[in-house]
C-alpha cells in the first residue's frame, strides 16, 4: 500500500464517520417568535391590542385628594374642621370592530377613603361604607361604579342616567349639584342614534338610582323612561331630555344650550321643569316646579381655566361656585374652589342656617 492509497482511504473513512454522526444528531426547533404588545390607534391614545386578539384595551384613571373647609354648602352645616376625601378611580375600556359596529365595554372601579369632622363629604359619588375609627369619623369603601357593554349605538349595564349624560351634566365645578339636576347611577338599556349632520337622539329604559338617603329604583316591571334630542355644531350645541318616573308617575324635562364665544371662552344655560314639586324623586330633584343653571368657562392660559356656575330653584335655593383649575404639570391639576349657598323660601324649613360658605382644594393626578 503506497502513501497515496493510505491517504485516500483515511479520508473516505472520516467522511463516512461524519455522515453517520450527522444522521444521529438532534436538531433543535426554531424558537417561537415573541409577540410584543402592539399599539392600537383606532380608538384614540392609550389603547393597545390584547395579545392574541384584535381587541383594543385602555387602562386609565386618576388619584385625587380633596381638602374641604368652612360650611357644607349642600346642607348648611358647619364642618368644624378639615374634611378629607381620597379617591382612586380606575377605568378599563375595550373596543373591537364587528359587522354590527364597534363592540365595547367600560368598567370603573372606585376606592374611597374619607376622614372628616362633619361626616359629610358634600358631593356626589363619595358614598362609602362607614367603619368607625375612634369617634367614627373615618370611612372606607370600594365600589364597582360603572360597567356596561356597547354595540354600535346600543348600551346595556350600569351607567349614569341619560337625563344627565345626554345634555352634558352641569359645569366644570366640583360642587356642581348643590341644586340637583337628577339622580346619577342606574341600570339601563339605551340606544343612541347619531346622524352625520350633528343631530342625535336617545331612548333609554332605566332602573333608577339611589343615594345615601333615598332609593329611586323601580318597584315593579315598569321602568323609568328617558328620551332626548340634540343638535351640535362648531358654534356649540342645544339638547333636550324628557323623563318619566314610573314610581311616582310624574315627568321632568331639561333643555340646555352651549355657545362657544371664542376658542377659549364658552357659556351655557340650562332650564328644567318637573310635574311634581318635590325633590324626592328620580329626575326632578330640585326644589319646586322649576330650576335654572348657568355657567361659563374661560381658558385664561394653556395651564389655567376659570369656571363659574350659578343656579336657582323654585323653592328659593341659590348656589354660586367659582374655581380655577391649574395644570401644574401635564397630568397633575390643582383646583381651588369657593362656593356659596343661600337657603331661602321653602328651603328655610329644612336647614338650620340661611347661608353657607365653603371651600375646597382638589389635587388630582390623571393617567
Curated annotation (Swiss-Prot):
Does the keyword section mention rRNA processing?
no
Question: What outcome follows a substitution of residue 150 to Q?
Answer: In strain: 019
Q: A Gene Ontology biological process annotation?
A: monoatomic ion transport
One GO MF annotation is: porin activity
Q: State the UniProt keywords alphabetically.
A: Cell outer membrane, Ion transport, Membrane, Porin, Signal, Transmembrane, Transmembrane beta strand, Transport
Question: Where is this protein chiefly located?
Answer: membrane
Q: Where is the signal peptide?
A: 1-22
Q: What happens on changing residue 190 to S?
A: In strain: 76-250
Q: Where in the cell is it found?
A: Cell outer membrane
Q: What is the effect of changing residue 280 to D?
A: In strain: 019 and 76-250
Q: What is the effect of changing residue 31 to S?
A: In strain: 019
Q: How does it sit in the membrane?
A: Multi-pass membrane protein
Report the Pfam families cross-referenced here: Porin_2
A GO CC annotation given for this chain: pore complex
Q: How does it assemble?
A: Homotrimer.
Q: Which family does it belong to?
A: Belongs to the alphaproteobacteria porin family.
Q: What's in the misc comment field? A: The pore formed by Omp2a is larger than the one formed by Omp2b. Omp2b pores have optimal permeability to allow growth and protection against harmful compounds. The larger pore formed by Omp2a may be advantageous for intracellular growth, when the bacterium is competing with the host cell for nutrients whose concentration is particularly low within the phagosome.
Q: What is known of its domains?
A: Consists of 16-stranded beta-barrel sheets, with large surface-exposed loops, that form a transmembrane pore at the center of each barrel. The pore is partially ocluded by a peptide loop that folds into the pore lumen.
What function does this protein fulfil? Forms passive diffusion pores that allow small molecular weight hydrophilic materials across the outer membrane.
Q: What is this protein called?
A: Porin Omp2b
Organism of this sequence: Brucella ovis
Its encoding gene is what? omp2b
Amino acid at each position: 500500500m503506497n502513501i497515496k492509497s493510505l491517504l485516500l482511504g483515511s479520508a473516505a473513512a472520516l467522511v463516512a464517520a461524519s455522515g453517520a454522526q450527522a444522521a444521529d444528531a438532534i436538531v433543535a426547533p426554531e424558537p417561537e417568535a415573541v409577540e410584543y404588545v402592539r399599539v392600537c390607534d383606532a380608538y384614540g391614545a392609550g389603547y393597545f391590542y390584547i395579545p392574541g386578539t384584535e381587541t383594543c384595551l385602555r387602562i386609565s384613571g386618576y388619584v385625587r385628594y380633596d381638602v374641604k373647609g368652612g360650611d357644607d354648602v349642600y346642607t348648611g352645616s358647619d364642618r368644624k374642621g378639615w374634611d378629607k376625601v381620597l379617591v382612586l378611580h380606575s377605568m378599563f375600556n375595550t373596543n373591537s370592530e364587528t359587522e354590527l359596529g364597534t363592540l365595547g365595554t367600560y368598567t370603573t372601579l372606585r376606592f374611597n377613603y374619607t376622614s372628616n369632622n362633619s361626616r359629610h363629604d358634600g358631593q356626589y359619588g363619595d358614598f362609602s361604607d362607614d367603619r368607625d375609627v375612634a369617634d367614627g369619623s373615618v370611612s372606607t369603601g370600594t365600589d364597582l361604579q360603572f360597567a356596561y357593554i356597547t354595540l354600535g349605538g346600543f348600551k346595556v349595564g350600569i351607567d349614569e342616567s341619560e337625563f344627565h349624560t345626554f345634555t352634558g351634566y352641569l359645569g366644570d365645578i366640583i360642587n356642581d349639584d348643590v341644586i340637583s339636576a337628577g339622580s346619577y347611577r342606574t341600570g339601563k338599556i339605551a340606544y343612541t342614534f347619531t346622524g352625520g349632520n350633528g343631530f342625535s337622539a336617545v331612548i333609554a329604559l332605566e332602573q333608577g338610582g339611589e343615594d345615601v338617603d333615598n332609593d329611586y329604583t323601580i318597584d315593579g316591571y315598569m321602568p323609568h323612561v328617558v328620551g332626548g334630542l340634540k343638535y351640535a355644531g362648531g358654534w356649540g350645541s342645544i339638547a333636550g331630555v324628557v323623563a318619566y318616573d314610573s314610581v311616582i308617575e310624574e315627568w321632568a324635562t331639561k333643555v340646555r344650550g352651549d355657545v362657544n364665544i371664542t376658542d377659549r371662552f364658552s357659556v351655557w344655560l340650562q332650564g328644567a321643569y318637573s310635574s311634581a314639586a318635590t325633590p324626592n324623586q328620580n329626575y326632578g330633584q330640585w326644589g319646586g316646579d322649576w330650576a335654572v343653571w348657568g355657567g361659563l368657562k374661560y381658558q385664561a392660559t394653556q395651564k389655567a381655566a376659570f369656571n363659574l356656575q350659578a343656579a336657582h330653584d323654585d323653592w328659593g335655593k341659590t348656589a354660586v361656585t367659582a374655581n380655577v383649575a391649574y395644570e401644574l404639570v401635564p397630568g397633575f391639576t390643582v383646583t381651588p374652589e369657593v362656593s356659596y349657598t343661600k337657603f331661602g323660601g321653602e328651603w328655610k324649613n329644612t336647614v338650620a342656617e340661611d347661608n353657607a360658605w365653603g371651600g375646597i382644594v382638589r389635587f388630582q393626578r390623571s393617567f
